[in-house]
Amino acid sequence: FISSNISNFGAKAFSVYGASKGAVDSLMRSLAVELAPRVRVNSVLPGGVRTAMTEHMYQDENLVNRIAAAYPLGLGEVKDIYMTVNFLLSDAARWVTGQQFTVDGGRTINITG
């Protein structure tokens, strides 16, 4: 599943989005138990990366700078997310199920930023 790091903290104007992603994570955990051992089920919780959904935010340089300041490792790219997904799809993750993988450049640990 692709969820969002927003499911792990509150964010102004994101209550419905955060709640829906929290539901995705809950479903993931239930399915991980129900489908084991035949199927592994996990969630990837990306931070904000440049996508079609966020493209409008990248038109404002001041906004981009404020967003980047909240990420200890700086802004991420889509490839940072798909590398985690590729790991989870590989045999290297054969003993991984029911887990949330937060891939957000440290944003979740820097909530005040």
Describe the function of each predicted region.
Residues 4:
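Residue(s) in the substrate-gating loop at a strand-loop-helix junction
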Residues 8, 45-56:
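Short, flexible catalytic-loop segment of classical short-chain dehydrogenase/reductase
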Residues 9-15, 91:
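Active-site loop immediately N-terminal to the catalytic Tyr-X3-Lys motif
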Residues 20, 28:
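Active-site helix of classical SDR
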Residues 32-37:
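Alpha-helical segment proximal to the catalytic Tyr-Lys
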Residues 70-81:
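A conserved structural motif in NAD(P)-dependent oxidoreductases
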